[in-house]
């Protein structure tokens, strides 16, 4: 644990941001591996003579920031973790980084099933890091869930995230393409959810480098296939 004055930290932070990048991404770095939350950063201005306690040395944080600026690799991948809702999740380039907008899926479920003691049977198709299913499994402890993904590496990450986030055993993971692992659950599900690939090919080519060059293509590219399917139905 490194102790540093607020004034010294702010000088260092200003120097790092002068190299490039933005405040929001830098805050993610500090939160993920520096041990400084957004609340900590907001409170700094109150007492400039105070002390901060960092989990990592400034030199290490600086090297991670340098790698991000040099290669456009997402900070979350460089840190190996991300925070989503109240979860701390392991992420690698085998899984999509959970976005804040994805929280809306969980919120919609909460609005439909308001009783948290309800015994739901839910499934998630294309779970990735497991974020959505883990959030639901924790919120509805009496429920049972199954999360699928076509990528075994992604499922291993999702499983680790579940083990690290919960002492419960109400969620399991199955490898397979969309509905195929769920045939035995036919007629038993109360809820099926998914945040599927939806980016059309022409849009995918225009995505920022940090997305296109690092996040899994299979988790992003899907809009063209959906369009083809719709056209076939016509």
For the regions a language model picked out, list residue spans one by one:
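Short SAM/SAH-binding signature in class I
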Residues: 189-194
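SAM-dependent Rossmann-like transferase core, predominantly class I methyltransferases
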Residues: 62-140, 145-160
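Conserved small/polar residues in nucleotide/adenosyl-binding loops
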Residues: 227-234
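Short conserved loop adjoining the S-adenosyl-L-methionine
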Residues: 178-186
């Amino acid at each position: 644990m490194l102790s540093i004055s607020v004034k010294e930290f702010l000088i260092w932070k200003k120097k790092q941001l002068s190299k490039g990048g933005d405040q929001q991404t830098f805050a993610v770095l500090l939160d993920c591996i520096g041990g400084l939350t957004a609340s900590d950063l907001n409170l700094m201005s109150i007492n400039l003579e105070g002390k901060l306690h960092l989990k990592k040395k400034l030199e290490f944080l600086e090297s991670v920031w340098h790698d991000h600026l040099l290669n456009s690799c997402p900070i979350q991948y460089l840190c190996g973790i991300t925070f989503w809702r109240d979860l701390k999740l392991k992420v690698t380039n085998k899984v999509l980084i959970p976005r804040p907008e994805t929280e809306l899926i969980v919120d919609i479920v909460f609005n439909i099933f308001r009783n948290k003691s309800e015994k739901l049977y839910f499934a998630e198709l294309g779970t990735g890091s497991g974020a959505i299913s883990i959030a639901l499994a924790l919120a509805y402890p009496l429920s049972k869930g199954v999360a699928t993904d076509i990528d075994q590496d992604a499922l291993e990450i999702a499983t680790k995230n579940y083990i690290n986030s919960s002492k419960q055993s109400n969620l399991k993971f199955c490898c397979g393409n969309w509905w195929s692992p769920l045939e035995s659950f036919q007629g038993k599900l109360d809820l099926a959810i998914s945040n599927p690939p939806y980016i059309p090919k022409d849009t995918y080519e225009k995505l920022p480098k940090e997305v296109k060059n690092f996040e899994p293509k299979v988790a992003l590219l899907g809009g063209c296939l959906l369009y083809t399917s719709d056209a076939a139905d016509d």
